[in-house]
Each structure stands twice: as structure tokens, then as C-alpha cells.
Amino acid sequence: MVSTMASGDVRGYVGWKDIVMFHPVGDISLNGMTRRIFSNAVRAMAGMLREDKGEQEAQKNQIALTVFGVVQPCAEYAKPLLEEKGYEVMVFHTSGTGGMALEELVKQGMIDAVLDISTTEVTDEVVGGVLTAGPLRMEAAGVMGIPQVIIPGAIDLVNFKTPDTVPAKWKDRVFYRHTPHITLMRTNVEESALLGQVFAQKINQAKGPSLLLIPLRGFSAYDSPQGPQAINLQGGPAARPWFWPEADQAFCQALKENLDASRVRYHELSMHINEPSFAEMAVQELDKMINGQ
């Protein structure tokens, strides 16, 4: 696609698909510069069409693995463990489009199992952040009946851009400046309880083996007694720390109260999500389900 919109927010055009965009620099017209850009775009397309795919490799089981910055250690531990077991791993960054791509590929039958480490997109959909993957996130694997291990990774935060993008109704909440362009808001007790209910409603639809694996010592790198100092929206010290065990407990309690135990297993571990042993347990459990154990 050759478009002057290629230099801006292209989510509406690209979405979750592998679309290549060329920015023509000038508006669409024929001149020396745009002719060269159009020519480059055509050559790129021709090259992709002529590519000799050769012999296809023997198909391995495709495992979808979700990741987000604050739970990246968990994903980095899990990925090689899955590969050692002979699986091919597709990694999805849960920034909205990543979760959309995951759900769509599962529905197309291209994914055999899901290790859903980062479910932060559900938080943004429920609470009102900017990285939502839509209302159907975390449902396709259950509907398709494929094995899934679901972890409440990064559900302790709601994603916004710069501080001025945070709605005024939340100006007195607890925040953390992840980068100059990413502002995180801590989920409170009420929101966490609502998330527990939503998780249960989604996972109760599962037609295949499903496990909720809960790291009781924290859902993200920030969700820990050793986590960073929280701030207010103006950048000063927050009224309370980011680590909020009562909020995490509210999520777990609501989840257990609403979960259909006849369809979904629930397992709590006295570990932090980013401990290597937690990733090992998640991989072991998914491997067992794939192999019918």
C-alpha cells in the first residue's frame, strides 16, 4: 500500500495483518520522486510474488505465546522450554493488534495451543485503556477447544499514552510512567474484582482443556514489594505504593467465585510471574494438556 497515511497511526489500515506500507513523501502525483517510490513498491511486490517457497518444513505444533514488557522475563523463560519440547512458538505482543491477531489465527485453525502470559488487553477493554484487543479477547481458544494456559499477566495496569491522555475522572489514581509516552494506571480493588468476573465468563466457554495459573506473589514486574515507586498524575509521589495485594486478592476471589470448576482448572502458585520456576510450571502444564495428560 502506498499512502501518505503511512507516517501516522496505521492501525485502522493494517490492523493485525501483514500489510507493507510505503510513504510517498509527497502527496499522490507523478513526479521524479514519487515515480521512484512507486517503482520501489512494485518491485517489492514482484519480489514477494516470485519468492520460491521451496519445500515446506514438516509442520510442528504451533504454540501462541503472549508477551508484554512487564512480564517479558516469563515469556523469555517459557519460549526456549517450549522449543526444547519440539513446539514452534509464535509470539504476540499484547498491544491491541497483537491480541487481535492471536484471536483471529486461533479461529483460522493456525494455532494448536495457547500460553497466554499477558492478558493486559482484557484490562484495557474492561476498564478503558488504549491497548484493548476488543471484547472477544481471550475467547477463541476456548471456543475452538484447543489447550490453553491463562495467566493474569499485567492485569494490574491500565495503559494510556502521555499523562494528558488519562481521562479526568482518574486524575487522583495511582500511576507509573513506564516511558515518556506510556502512562500506566494501577487497577484498584473494584476493577480487579470485575476483571475476575470477566475472566471467568470468558473462560467458562472453553470446550477444551483449560487452566488458570495464578502467580500469587505478583502479576507483573511492578506488582511486587520491590516494585517501583508509584506516582500521581503530576509526577509526584502517589498516596499508596503500586504493589496492592488487596487488589490482586479481589481478582482471585471473584474469579474463583464465578469459575465453572467442572470446565476449567484453577491453580494458585506461591510465586511471582517473572520467576523462572513459574514459567517452567506453565510450560509443563500446557505440554501435559497437549499430550492428553
Positions of predicted regions on the chain:
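Active-site gating loops and adjacent loop-to-helix segments of metal-dependent hydrolytic enzymes
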Residues: K169-H178
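Short loop/turn segments immediately following the C-termini of beta-strands
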Residues: G153
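Metallocofactor- and cofactor-centric catalytic cores in central/energy metabolism, strongly enriched
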Residues: M1-V143, Q148-I150, F160, L184-Q293
